[in-house]
């Protein structure tokens, strides 16, 4: 039997081959040069891999599954381009962000173009087209809502952990839910099955984002392909920050208001007060919830999806 990491490597290579084959016009260069630059990036392809694993579970048509995978990855890249502008990040996947390489106006247009490309690909699927587009667009809108909430929450000291969890379900969970559920929609599975896959992906997304927030503080900048600690400097209300603010009010205020403090000071604070431990446990709970959702599937359909959860849970970048 093929090893799981060999399977995901194969899916990633096949996906990259299809993405590189996608016809991107040469002109106008103002639009298509930054799009080509973005899509040549060495992403982890977590979302396309999930689409393909879900497609394998439901025995979906391979060509249609690939189109779904392309569509969700394009939407993901569209959000990254615009997020980088909003967060003023200068590096993504180890290379300059689009707005840093060109300018904000170019990056905005490139993101718009990539989003439109995703729509064209999804609408070219001949089976269940309306249902796929409706589900896909609802998830895409939720991602935008989540990003809006993330910006609204910056430096807002009234934000609670429930607010944060609602935000990450939209910003990260909705698209991963779509990755898991769209193959079930394609294969005309029951509403109960589609919903279970959506909830599976949303729980996976919550665990993914909480884990990502931890990597933003405790990760290796070389593996992450970017500098760390920007969540702190931008006033992001992550779960760690909310717990610190609510339960270690004076110590957190002194630390966060001291502009001379370094990332290592924050690491020590979160570890010493067992905030890191609590947040890691929270991520584990969401990964566990994701596992429970797919246990309604036949056993042979669960194995690869459970392996995927473990892969996401143990990632270091």
Residue ranges and their predicted role:
Residues 299-317:
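Short, amphipathic C-terminal "tail helix"
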Residues 24-253, 310:
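Mg2+-dependent prenyl diphosphate-binding active-site environment of isoprenoid biosynthetic enzymes
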Residues 1-23:
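N-terminal amphipathic/basic leader segments beginning at the initiator methionine
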Residues 251-295:
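Mobile late-domain/C-terminal helix-loop "cap" segments
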Residues 241, 290, 305:
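Hydrophobic, well-ordered secondary-structure elements that form the walls
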